[in-house]
Design a protein with these regions (language model features):
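Terminal connector regions
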Residues: 42, 59-81
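Exposed aromatic-hydrophobic patches
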Residues: 12-13, 55-63
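Asparagine-centered strand-capping/turn motif at beta-strand->loop junctions
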Residues: 15-20
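Conserved aromatic beta-strand anchor motif in extracellular beta-sandwich/beta-rich domains
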Residues: 28-34
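Transition segment at domain starts
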Residues: 1-8, 62
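Short acidic/proline- and small/hydrophobic-mixed sequence motifs that coincide with surface turns
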Residues: 21-25, 40, 70
């Protein structure tokens, strides 16, 4: 997890389409937590039109007021949409 130039918390990564389906759309959901384990917020990113065997980058951004309290995150869902 990093912070962008606005101080928003950013989770970056990549996913790969391991199926033979073309133009797969995927949703990545991340939950952001405080040091005490309190859920601060949930955000999503969508990777669109991912062809067979192709890799796509994602960036899940939390820009809420409590962004400075975030200490860790969990990717809680990765699904085709």
């Amino acid at each position: 997890m990093s912070a962008n130039r606005f101080g928003h918390r950013v989770v970056e990564g990549a996913i790969r389409n391991i199926s033979s389906d073309s133009n797969v759309n995927a949703e990545i959901k991340a939950e952001y937590y405080s040091a005490t384990g309190t859920l601060i917020g949930t955000e999503v990113d969508i990777v669109r039109r991912l062809g067979p065997g192709k890799t796509g980058a994602f960036e899940v951004v939390y820009s809420g007021e409590q962004r400075w309290d975030i200490k860790y995150y969990k990717i809680v869902n990765l699904q085709e949409i």
